[in-house]
Amino acid sequence: MKVTPGFKASDLPLARTLTLGGMKVHALEAGIQWLDGGAMFGVVPRPLWEKKIPPDSRHRIPLALRCLLVEAPNALVLVDTGIGNKESEKFKDIYGVDNAGDPTRLEEAIRSLGFHTGDVDLVVSTHLHFDHAGGNLVLREDGTLAPSFPRARFVVQKGELGFAGSPNERVRASYMAKNYAPLVEADLVDVVEGPTELVEGVRLLPTPGHTPFHQSVILESQGEKAIFLADLCPTSAHLPL
């Protein structure tokens, strides 16, 4: 799909399905955000990256808020939750957030597959930046926060949770306590440390870089294997560059 400066979330399908051995894996498109292209590509010269992803008038490029829904043999596992519905209109303008309102686009994607938020058993955060963990909690009409997935346990690396609570100045704006602290207080978080076999067919592997305790998700079924890299590789354009 060609990415243009006018690219919208509605240009993406709600969900795409891959069969991995005997397991179904669904890529959920929870929306898009627009971030500074130079910041995303770092030392790569602009003349190179803008050929891959043209920026808008504010020098931003669109990034998919992509989550993963895994039909593991013994659990329904959601990996990352996008931005959610808690942010202000000012925030949405700054970051170019396009993820629908109520229900969020993530919830629509889950419903499109015949599931509901209450069917999710485990929610894995690859890391706790707002664009990956913002949908962990939902803002209700009365102004209170509630878990977006009422039956789920939330899984995060111990180091990531600690770092989120005391980040350095460079990344402070990316971490928001409202996206995870209420879950910790409600004892809904399962902290893991290092490589972890989550459930049959789903393993967690620390892949530090984007954050010190970022983790990727390895899926295996009937001899086939896939890995969800999350922000270890922000876009496909990063690979040839």
What kind of region is each of these model predictions?
Residues 88-93, 167, 239-241:
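Short acidic, glycine/proline-rich loop/turn micro-motifs
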Residues 36, 163-166, 198-201, 212-215, ...:
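Short acidic/glycine-rich loop or secondary-structure boundary segments that cap or lie
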Residues 69, 203-205, 215-240:
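Metal-dependent phosphodiesterase/nuclease catalytic metal-binding core
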Residues 135-141:
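A short, conserved alpha-helix within the catalytic core of class I
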Residues 1-115, 119-131, 141, 223-230, ...:
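Metallo-beta-lactamase
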